[in-house]
């Protein structure tokens, strides 16, 4: 790449400016990458807790529904589920984490009272109520897990993008610029040495010509001096 650059002082100044800008950009991206990794680790810790809660609530919901089916029968359980009139509502917002937009999911009407579940209190048992509560808890944890894991995915994508940009600067662009800078500096030094050598030759030649001219003038003056003595 360096051979494609003309070795001029103007190009050298432009490359030095690009190096300065690229080095600042590299430092900024490194700080961003490190900050993103720290944020990602915090979200990862949160995700592990959420995943444990989700697994636990799933097991509780399964036990509760199995118990309700065993005690009340599938028909009663399906009837209670079909009686639900108000379904959960979800709204999504967003927040910014170091330039990464991640979702925030707000849920409502997930947890319900006995009346809100739609089935008659007199026609069901506590086992069905326990199963309903367990699945409401499970749904809340599913929503939270979806939010956290989506944030993790977006953060990880941004980390990888930032890493690629850091590596492109560190291992491609900056080395090429340094090579170009070194190439131009070497060529300019060669040109300067050649110019100094050329000027010395001109000076030496001029001195030789001046010495020769002085010798000729001196030779012309000597016969005149001899004639005057005679």
Swiss-Prot record:
Instruction: Please name the GO terms that the record assigns under molecular function.
Output: ATP binding; proton-transporting ATP synthase activity, rotational mechanism; proton-transporting ATPase activity, rotational mechanism
GO BP terms in the entry: proton motive force-driven plasma membrane ATP synthesis
Spell out the GO cellular component terms annotated for this protein, sorted alphabetically and separated by semicolons: plasma membrane
**Annotated region Disordered: where?**
204-230
Cystine pairs: none
One Pfam family here: ATP-synt_D
Q: Work out whether the entry's keyword set contains Cell membrane.
A: yes
Query: Keywords, A to Z?
Result: ATP synthesis, Cell membrane, Hydrogen ion transport, Ion transport, Membrane, Transport
Acidic residues biased stretches:
208-230
**What topology in the membrane does the UniProt record assign?**
Peripheral membrane protein
Where does this one sit in the cell?
A: Cell membrane
PANTHER family annotated for this entry? V-TYPE ATP SYNTHASE SUBUNIT D
**UniProt similarity note:** Belongs to the V-ATPase D subunit family.
Q: How does it assemble?
A: Has multiple subunits with at least A(3), B(3), C, D, E, F, H, I and proteolipid K(x).
Q: According to its UniProt entry, what is the function of this protein?
A: Component of the A-type ATP synthase that produces ATP from ADP in the presence of a proton gradient across the membrane.
Q: What is this protein called?
A: A-type ATP synthase subunit D
Q: From which source organism is this entry?
A: Haloarcula marismortui (strain ATCC 43049 / DSM 3752 / JCM 8966 / VKM B-1809)
